[in-house]
Amino acid sequence: MDAKTDDKDAGKCPFSSGSHAHRNRDWWPDQLDIQVLHHNSKKSDPLGEAFNYAEEFKKLDLAALKQDLTALMTDSQDWWPADFGHYGGLFIRLAWHSAGTYRISDGRGGAGAGQQRFAPLNSWPDNANLDKARRLLWPIKQKYGNKISWADLFVLSGNVALESMGFKTFGFAGGRADTWEPEELYWGPEGTWLGDSRYSGERELSDPLGAVQMGLIYVNPEGPNGNPDPVGSAKDIRETFYRMAMNDEETVALIAGGHTFGKTHGAGDPSLLGPDPEAGALEDQGLGWKSGYGTGFGADAITGGPEVIWSQEPTKWSNHFFENLFNFDYELTKSPAGAQQWVAKNAEPSIPDPFDPSKKRLPTMLTSDLALRFDPIYEKISRRFFENPDQFADAFARAWYKLTHRDMGPVPRYLGPEVPKEVLLWQDPVPAVDHELVSEQDIAALKAKILASGLSVAQLVSAAWASASTFRGSDKRGGANGGRIRLSPQKDWEVNHPAELAQVLSKLEAIQSEFNAQGGGKKVSIADLIVLGGAAAIEKAAQEAGTAVTVPFTPGRTDASQEQTDVESFKPLEPRADGFRNYVSSIRHQFMKPEEALVDKAQLLKLTGPELTVLVGGLRVLGANYGHTTHGVLTDRPERLSNDFFVNLLDMKYAWAPSPTTTGIYEARDRKSGELKWTGTRVDLIFGSHSQLRAFAEVYAQADAKEKFVHDFVAAWTKVMNADRFDIVR
């Protein structure tokens, strides 16, 4: 029997999840949101905290799985028939669009977590009908269970699609563990699909975005804002592909390689498409874009607007894309859906129909395809690929591998028998350990030498933080391993105090040289010494504040060379702001408030709210501020690891007010005398203003929290220092 729903109070959800319920964000939209720090916790993982995907993947029979995927490619289903009898084009698009959300600015997006299963990605206009691809994969995912994640399966399906059509891929690595809830990412300011208010000035795309319109992966295939201008399209392509770490050659290879296969779908009026998966009815069971045009699928399929087939053999690897690009001139036309596209002039029908073998079509191209011919830089590369198919095949194989693996981090995270032996520069390689590591006795001796070197607690802590805090949990780049703080571009970043950093490194290098010259095969890297110096300084600072503590240290980091470091690709890791050091760049554009940038940085470091809180409080009293400013250094005993920051911030003896002379600075004055006692920034004051952060701060300001504060700080510090240590068990 159905539940009664017509009573006055019946059917009302007691939680704030109803469509008309007011959430805190509705009442206070400007409130700092720190919930992003607690998303995708193990508590939301149905596989449990003990589940280890890397270990489970090792049990996978990859060859059998690939055999099943190969069979799927030609197993056309009546409910969503395969174009040309082969699903290859569909699964290439699935893998591409899973990986293609990656952006180099903050490392977010990409294929690494299977996020295409969730909103908003599962309902983006550019991902229309990829829900069908995911449903086609379900029987295979069901069969192999936890041995293969959705994230890995999406990418592998694209590889198998290519291989099943005669292309030799560069390789495949597993290791992408699924997440179980949508990531809260900033995809743009627009409130409507395909909106483009992300631009300013002369079509300047705002940071950190990578696509030209809301709901697109890269560019509008019809041209900028639907304007069929190939040269203008090339500008959009260059910008968006650069923002996902692709150069011009990789860009050409990816577009041409992907468009060697399959087709676009614009058989009829797009207004006949039903709602996307997230907006669909219960009975639609997560499938969206139900079409009212004809049968709604097969020859009547509508995904977007254009109806384009690029190749005479759309289920085989070939050079037909470039042959058609250069051998014909094109004139503007419209698809059956009314979209702008191009058709070959003076050509004979040579393109197969996807469902009727008796029919042939004229060669067609997208505006974004013609960009590869009419942009002078792209044209030169395209013509070389046209004349040298082997170079094209190699470039596409490498670019596809980079596209689908860019957010996986260092090679030690790569799993499976198809991982290439060749190490690539974009993987940020570090040398293998080829020597005996330091012992506990050595560590103690090295700490003593570091503390006797004349370097201060603040200098050592600052150097260690600068080295390790470059880590991004999004694409697993950065971190202390490799010691790249010694190299360009990091050694010259404003936030790292280049002159002072050079002094610190010089003294640590002298200690390293002396130790490594002892012989016996035992060595220590600068990367390890930087982290060890921070540990030694924290132990000293804690001891002087009255708490004895040992900061955990695991040796094994190695020193990368400048040749192993792609300077251009490391530039986006330079912080615009780092609230942990009270730093805001004076020359780079800020698109977040300082406190928002702090939370953003904490999320990239995979920190929780309490960890963020204790680290800021500790780093302030240790003197790790940029420029050695005293803003937020709320203590009369700096370089001692005390909870003074929290005690004094929350002390009602002082009243805070904006500085009358300096924007962004606040002054704390004695309520009775008016005497100036402290200064702070927005990042400092947020721990007294924001109710949840204040709750954390109150814990550390309590009289019984002195030891807890030190131990919690050390735990959070160690987490950051080891964030990129995928070689150790944690």
Swiss-Prot record:
List residue numbers at the site (Transition state stabilizer). R93
CC cofactor: heme b
Q: Which residues form the signal peptide?
A: 1-21
Superkingdom of origin: Bacteria
Checking InterPro entries in the record gives:
Catalase_peroxidase, Haem_peroxidase, Haem_peroxidase_sf, Peroxidases_AS, Peroxidases_heam-ligand_BS
After translation, the protein is modified as follows: Formation of the three residue Trp-Tyr-Met cross-link is important for the catalase, but not the peroxidase activity of the enzyme.
Q: Which residues bind heme b?
A: H259
For this protein, the Enzyme Commission number is 1.11.1.21
What are the GO MF terms of this UniProt record? catalase activity; heme binding; metal ion binding
Keywords for this protein = Heme, Hydrogen peroxide, Iron, Metal-binding, Oxidoreductase, Peroxidase, Signal
Cross-link Tryptophyl-tyrosyl-methioninium (Tyr-Met) (with W-96) residue location(s): Y218-M244
Q: Report which reactions are catalysed by this protein.
A: H2O2 + AH2 = A + 2 H2O; 2 H2O2 = O2 + 2 H2O
Annotated active site: H97
State the free-text cofactor note. Answer: Binds 1 heme b (iron(II)-protoporphyrin IX) group per dimer.
NCBIfam families listed in its UniProt record: cat_per_HPI, PRK15061.1
Query: Member of which family?
Result: Belongs to the peroxidase family. Peroxidase/catalase subfamily.
What is its biological role?
Bifunctional enzyme with both catalase and broad-spectrum peroxidase activity.
Q: What is this protein called?
A: Catalase-peroxidase
The protein's organism comes out as Rhodopseudomonas palustris (strain BisA53)
What is the organism lineage in this UniProt record? Answer: Bacteria, Pseudomonadati, Pseudomonadota, Alphaproteobacteria, Hyphomicrobiales
